[in-house]
Amino acid sequence: MHTMATALTLEPTALPSDAIEVGRIADAWGLQGWFKVQPYSADPEALFSCKRWYLQPAARGAKAFGGTVLLPIRQAKDHGGMVLAWAQDIDDRNTAEALRGARIFVPRSSFPSPPPGEYYWVDLIGLQVINRQGLALGQVRELRATGAQTLLVLAHEQDGKAGKRMIPFVPAFVDQVELPQKRIIVDWQPDY
């Protein structure tokens, strides 16, 4: 049986500049070193497609490692809203438990391409939003799922004061998403 020393074989590394936090290790699963991951997305495809995860220690509790480490993934699969994963050199329950709470990052460049007309939210954050008349409405700060639709939450300035504007991210209001130009064109007015 492996001991905590196994966890120390994780390779210290720098976090890639395009790293996106995609989940956290929830707990060990079984006796063979598998562990459960709580993904931050309803579609955890990035966890399945990337075979090199970057871990950072849990914010609270015991830490089995310090700084950022590289975790090569042998296998990852869906498990009812969670992801089960098995990593290189993690071969028993104790070692898997030592990773509990670790934050998981993957490079944005390793995400699979979304279907046409679909976007990763992370790619929309920071884009400028302008209307059909060319008026700047603000910059995307976050996206909010409301059940019926997703909202673009924009930061903007009006009369020298910081403000917030929300626009439904639906085809009726969004004309174009131009990622290379870092902008979204909408059918919306500032007084809506």
UniProtKB/Swiss-Prot annotation:
Q: Which UniProt keywords apply?
A: Chaperone, Cytoplasm, Ribosome biogenesis, rRNA processing
Cross-referenced Pfam families: PRC_RimM, RimM
MF term (GO), any: ribosome binding
Q: Which residues form the PRC barrel domain?
A: 116-192
The compartments listed are: Cytoplasm
Its chief place of residence is cytoplasm
* GO CC aspect terms: cytoplasm; ribosome
Q: Name one GO biological process term.
A: ribosomal small subunit biogenesis
Q: Which InterPro entries match?
A: PRC_barrel-like_sf, PRC_RimM, RimM, RimM_N, RimM_N_sf, Transl_B-barrel_sf
Q: What is known of its domains?
A: The PRC barrel domain binds ribosomal protein uS19.
Q: What's its job?
A: An accessory protein needed during the final step in the assembly of 30S ribosomal subunit, possibly for assembly of the head region. Essential for efficient processing of 16S rRNA. May be needed both before and after RbfA during the maturation of 16S rRNA. It has affinity for free ribosomal 30S subunits but not for 70S ribosomes.
**Family the UniProt entry places it in:** Belongs to the RimM family.
Subunit structure, interactors included: Binds ribosomal protein uS19.
Matching PANTHER family, A to Z? RIBOSOME MATURATION FACTOR RIMM (PTHR33692:SF1)
The protein's name: Ribosome maturation factor RimM
Q: Which organism is it from?
A: Verminephrobacter eiseniae (strain EF01-2)
User: Which gene does this sequence derive from?
Assistant: rimM
